């Protein structure tokens, strides 16, 4: 008996919607990364993108434990000399709440072309509305 290897053209991808209200950031991101990779499926193949599409709503209501709301820092560089910037979790939620979940999930995905393809299947929205109703996403309770 030969080992099953999934082919990119035969992979069936479903659409799911996840409500991030009150969910802990790290625990939510771990499950999202697992499902984006396709590790929850029996036909998972490491070198093939077998994951599903995931829509995250209410990203502005995601929670963190402890004092991370004020102590956790996000860094980025503008590209100019001395252009290192930083913001706390609270400031990031106020400025761009989608980025908090995107950064957490992106760090848990493989680095390289396959990881970037997996990341493109993640759609994050700050509010309760999303523009993917035509895909008829199923509610995923994490």
UniProtKB/Swiss-Prot annotation:
Gene3D superfamilies: Ribosomal protein L13
Biological process per Gene Ontology, one example term: translation
Molecular-function GO terms, alphabetical: mRNA binding; structural constituent of ribosome
Recorded GO CC terms: cytosolic large ribosomal subunit
Matches recorded under CDD domains: Ribosomal_L13 (cd00392)
Classification via InterPro entries: Ribosomal_uL13, Ribosomal_uL13_bac-type, Ribosomal_uL13_CS, Ribosomal_uL13_sf
Keywords: Ribonucleoprotein, Ribosomal protein
Name of one Pfam family that matches: Ribosomal_L13
Keyword Ribonucleoprotein: yes
Highest taxon, organism lineage: Bacteria
Family assignment from sequence similarity: Belongs to the universal ribosomal protein uL13 family.
Alphabetized PANTHER family for the sequence: LARGE RIBOSOMAL SUBUNIT PROTEIN UL13M (PTHR11545:SF2), RIBOSOMAL PROTEIN L13 (PTHR11545)
Record's subunit section: Part of the 50S ribosomal subunit.
Function: This protein is one of the early assembly proteins of the 50S ribosomal subunit, although it is not seen to bind rRNA by itself. It is important during the early stages of 50S assembly.
Database matches in HAMAP family: Ribosomal_uL13
Name of the protein this chain belongs to: Large ribosomal subunit protein uL13
Species, as recorded: Haemophilus influenzae (strain PittEE)
């Amino acid at each position: 008996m030969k080992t099953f290897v999934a082919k990119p053209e035969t992979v069936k991808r479903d659409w799911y919607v996840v409500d991030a209200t009150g969910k802990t950031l790290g625990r939510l991101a771990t499950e999202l990364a697992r499902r984006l990779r396709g590790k929850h499926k029996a036909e998972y193949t490491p070198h093939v993108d077998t994951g599903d599409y995931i829509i995250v709503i209410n990203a502005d209501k995601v929670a963190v434990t402890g004092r991370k709301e004020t102590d956790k820092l996000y860094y980025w560089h503008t590209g100019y000399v001395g252009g290192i910037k930083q913001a706390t979790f609270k400031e990031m939620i106020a400025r761009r709440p989608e980025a908090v979940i995107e950064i957490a999930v992106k760090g848990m995905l493989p680095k390289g072309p396959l990881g970037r393809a997996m990341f493109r299947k993640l759609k994050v929205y700050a509010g309760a509305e999303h523009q993917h109703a035509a895909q008829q996403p199923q509610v995923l309770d994490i």
